[in-house]
Amino acid sequence: VPVFADPPEWSSANSYEPLEIVIHKGNSYTSKTFVPVGIDISDPQYWALTGNYNAQVEQYRQEVSAMQGQVTAMQGQVTQNKDDIAGLKRQASDFDAEIAARKKVYVTYKDFGAKLDGVTDDSAAIVAAHNYANTNGIPIVQHGGKVKCNFQAEVKTSCLLDMEFVLLANSPQPVYSIEADDAQTFTFSGSVTADSVTSPDARLNGCFAMIQNENDGWNLGAREGTGTTIYHREVKAYDKAGMLITSPFYIPNTGTFTCSNVHSLWERPVEFAGATITYDNSEQANIPNFLRVRRNNTAVKDITFNPLSVPPAAASSLESNGLIFVHACANVKVSNISGNNNSSDNETTTASTYSYLLGFNSTFNCHVDNMLGVGGWGVVGSDWCDCMTYSNCVLNRVDNHFGAFGTYILTNSKLTGICAFTLPYGNANAVISNVDMFPRAKKYSCIDFRKDVNLAFQGTLHINNCTLNEPNSIRGNIFINAVKSVSSGSQPDVKPRIVINGLYYNTTRQLCYSPAGMALNYSINGFEGNFSMWGAPNVKMSNSICWNMDTNGLLTPETIIHIDNCTLNKKETTPSTDWFFTGEFIIANCKINNTFKCNTQDDQAKHLVTGCIFKNGETVIGRGAVSFVGCVIDTVPTLTHYKSKSCFGIADAEK
């Protein structure tokens, strides 16, 4: 068996036994036989080369070198791959950011650094949030938090702000302003007529516009003769084809018109919701303007107003100072508004007569729904509006201040406190239906015709299925306070019409009033309550029950009264009052119980009683003509002083 020599390194000075292995210059040699001293390693007689390691090592070295080259190349590739991966990561990060931005459906105030702790001034963050939202067309959503209103923000996207806002005495007004995307102002020359089917300027097509020009001929009312320039104002909406949707408010006019806040009727809808507003009103005489709306197709909802004090007794403001003010736009709905005032009682408070929670000016087709004005704050004001609807509300005043056109509706609501619904100049079709009225401020009329420019309401007032409960009323107060309009230039005096269809009237205040010379028309059906008249009304009443007939001695010779198919009573608790019917008085098909005591001093009076049942003998006194036709008379009435008395279809004994 071969064994390694000792030492293994070959030397010619050593002798070697057979089969000994030595190493020389990296190779291994094995002795074939005994090797004497002095034999060279290259002598093949004695040595056999058994291991050429240098060649193998070289081969290995070359292979390793090649592999190192490959490794180096691979390391370079890895480095490149790392760089590529880093680049891809950066691209992916950019894509992620872009995708996140595209997927972002809303932003919050806190995204822009707002603390919302009620102490920190978050004005810059809030304004920045709205600027970003307006630019990117995304809404703002913020749940929770409190902020002081030291800012003014322009809003063009929807906002859900379920948080508290503290209005300060020096808060900018308005705090929020919902604006149109591309509102324009321009002038044009031409004519604007009432029945136009095309817009006077192509730029108005498909737009809402507030149009005005100066008209010196419209100096009316208290301003007449002062030289003050009155603006001829109209609010219009045109469809895409250019057809006029609403007629001009005033006379046809030709000249140069200014169109302000012209913007598309089809602009993107915006919703503003959720805010709770706290305000201490003790330092101010009105409510500050928190939100202004000047954008079509806007919805404002779920707003709670918590004033910490009542307004001063001398409070006075226009509707533009209201908590929410809608101006120069169309199709706006305001809903679920609560005005909670814990420091006052809405049944008695009158201090907030002119401090509006909600105001409208120069609008078209707006709707207020579910507004709860608790604590004397339920006041709504409007100027120059076309088509207004109030529904499901609890209010103490609806002050339609100037210019009512189109349809004005108050329905399914309650009026209390001041309990007033005013109607200004205009030809609106006003409808009050399913409304409960509980007046607590006795000096106000429930329905008041304003005459701010000496022109009064000229439309039709419908009262349907309403109730009025006023147990402690004053007899001299008026339910409908009509005023006589005046003619001025081309503004004719148009007499309004009043239609009552279903009214429960538990009050002694005057029902039918007409100023002398106006001859206001009342058409009444389905009435029950105390019936009273004053002035010179023309009344046609049917299918009603009158507890007490009271004319207060104030009818004029122009009065015309037709009563048909009614029951006329006198309650034992009511004062003993005579009827003073002057003019034309017809009672037909009625049941008359202890009621008919009629006095008149007019020789021209004409009284006709036909188809009636008299249960108690009454004294009928007059100087004109009286006729009884086809009546059933249990106890014969006494007819005195009439210059002409006639009876037809009555039994001889009764005659």
What is the predicted role of each segment?
Residues 1-76, 82-83:
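Tryptophan-rich substrate-binding surfaces of secreted polymer-degrading and adhesive proteins
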Residues 21-36, 196-253:
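Ser/Thr/Gly-rich low-complexity blocks that favor extended beta-strand/coil architectures
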Residues 35-56, 227-284:
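Small/polar beta-strand repeat architecture
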Residues 39-44, 113-129, 284-291:
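Short, polar loop/linker segments at the starts of domains and inter-domain junctions
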Residues 97, 109-143, 193-203:
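Acidic Gly/Asp/Thr-rich repetitive segments characteristic of extracellular carbohydrate-active
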Residues 123, 127-184, 192, 213-232, ...:
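N-terminal extracellular ligand-recognition/capping segment immediately after the signal peptide
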Residues 153, 167-182, 279-286, 290, ...:
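Extracellular beta-rich repeat passengers
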Residues 161, 185-216, 265-281, 292-308, ...:
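Parallel beta-helix/beta-solenoid
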